[in-house]
């Protein structure tokens, strides 16, 4: 009887070891199996038309495969019971075939001819479709302001800009005046709110409206870094101190297409930043244990 129990114990122990060794990662206690891992490696090699790899390339391939499977598992868990339809999968595959100038239906046949399990490929297609749905949801919360558009165009130095600014020039160069100019700077908020009593005892104010390219080079550098209603530091010039306060910046001769291009660029940048944070947070909150030998 003891011998029989020993045999049973050994049998179950071996089974548990075999089952554990078949798991290469856990994602929130959802297993990724060795078969899934091998299928993903084979799929990546087939899609990249790779026949053989060096040990270093094999390590890199393993890292890519396990990462894609972990990301995939997290996305499936996030999506829950919601389904990706067969029509969506078919359309995604057709889109890949079109981009690669392949006849419809030939991609899965190609993978099968390379002994690749098509389920691994379809699983990745599903995860990419989920990712697209996530990005679509994030994009609805993204807005681009006119100020952001102007800043982006101005920073490119590709368009002529008309600038209106107020220049405060000290009446002398004493230490007392320098302190007064710094105090003035701290009080300058909006151009329209500047009162003469703020500066008349120690400085004068000049209003200039002109194309940025027509302004003296030193001031161009200062003005480029300032948004409307922003003020420069107090700087020294000849026998006086100056402060520049930008009131308005108007971009000249910008077409609708150019404006739309900037809007799309800024929108995509914001979506990308939101997506990166979304996926980073997803990883941080997850329990991930990789048991694949390094």
Swiss-Prot record:
- In the UniProt record, the signal sequence range is 1-18
InterPro entries this protein is in?
A: OMP_Chaperone_SurA, Trigger_fact/SurA_dom_sf
Q: Which UniProt keywords apply?
A: Signal
Domain of life the protein comes from? Bacteria
Query: Signal among the record's keywords?
Result: yes
Instruction: Provide the protein name.
Output: Uncharacterized protein RBE_0210
In its UniProt entry, the species of origin is given as Rickettsia bellii (strain RML369-C)
